[in-house]
Amino acid sequence: MWQLLLPTALVLTAFSGIQAGLQKAVVNLDPKWVRVLEEDSVTLRCQGTFSPEDNSIKWFHNESLIPHQDANYVIQSARVKDSGMYRCQTALSTISDPVQLEVHMGWLLLQTTKWLFQEGDPIHLRCHSWQNRPVRKVTYLQNGKGKKYFHENSELLIPKATHNDSGSYFCRGLIGHNNKSSASFRISLGDPGSPSMFPPWHQITFCLLIGLLFAIDTVLYFSVRRGLQSPVADYEEPKIQWSKEPQDK
């Protein structure tokens, strides 16, 4: 059994080493906002290492492969169904961490560049209108209280976030003569040393390989055990008959 397990373990170890040595691909959004309105245009860019023989890219939406192999994946007119997690992978890069994109319906949307901020991070907020219609007299509100007012629409920048900046945000302004408000969005701050939302991909790969090795070990164990027990079960003790020699008569 150990003679069978050793080559398998070597193969899995080699594969794990190759995976650990590869750089992870990265997905970037252009524009940078993770929340958009319907009919907005969004470009997802994949950065990774390519091989001379293969410069194609694999794109995934909610873990399903997208039939697209270019470095840029363009969503010309976003729809709610385009919401979800996006990943990419190149020939010489491991699969990227997921980037979450949300597509909303409405007149106004409070946009942000990240889902989770750390203390000290800059926070960029934007009061975005459907079809980029002009918005005037924009107010950003935190926990129901006015935080910043702009006569002409502008982004709200918090240079270094503190825990006092966490809370529920929304914006409101005039589109034409109509007063419109966005839905609320909660901004949460984590500690700088807090772990990432998603475990590193090489850790996931290692766990999968260990699980696969355990499954192979179990199958081989029972196969060898069955093979050793079968001859014993089929064995029957021979019957011995004694006969007297002629001189014993």
Curated annotation (Swiss-Prot):
Name the GO terms of the biological process aspect.
Answer: dendritic cell antigen processing and presentation; Fc receptor-mediated immune complex endocytosis; natural killer cell degranulation; neutrophil activation; positive regulation of bone resorption
Free-text description of this protein's post-translational modifications in UniProt: N-glycosylated.
Q: Quick one: signal sequence residues?
A: 1-20
Which positions fall inside the Ig-like C2-type domain?
22-102, 119-188
Q: What is this protein called?
A: Low affinity immunoglobulin gamma Fc region receptor III-A
Q: Where in the cell is it found?
A: Cell membrane
Q: What does this protein do?
A: Receptor for the invariable Fc fragment of immunoglobulin gamma (IgG). Binds with intermediate affinity to both IgG2a and IgG2b. Can bind to IgG2a and IgG2b monomers. Does not display binding to IgG1 or IgG3. Recognizes neutralizing virus-specific IgGs displayed on the cell surface of infected cells and triggers antibody-dependent cellular cytotoxicity (ADCC). Confers protection to lethal influenza virus infection.
Q: Which residues cross the membrane?
A: 204-224
Outline which residue ranges sit on the Extracellular face. Answer: 21-203
Q: In this UniProt entry, which residues form the Cytoplasmic topological domain(s)?
A: 225-249
Molecular function terms from GO: IgE binding; IgE receptor activity; IgG binding; IgG receptor activity; immune receptor activity
- Induction remarks: By lipopolysaccharide, interferon beta and IFNG.
How does the annotation summarize its subunit structure? Answer: Forms a heterooligomeric complex with ITAM-containing signaling subunits FCER1G. Interacts (via transmembrane domain) with signaling subunits; this interaction is a prerequisite for receptor complex expression on the cell surface and intracellular signal transduction. Binds the Fc region of antigen-complexed IgG.
What Pfam families does UniProt report for this protein, alphabetically?
Ig_2, Ig_3
Which pairs are disulfide-linked?
Answer: 46-88, 127-171
Q: Which residues carry this modification: Phosphotyrosine?
A: 235
Residues with glycosylation annotation = 62, 164, 179
Effect in UniProt of substituting residue 235 to W: Abolishes receptor ligation-induced phosphorylation
Q: Which gene holds the coding sequence for this protein?
A: Fcgr4
The top of its lineage is: Eukaryota, Metazoa, Chordata, Craniata, Vertebrata
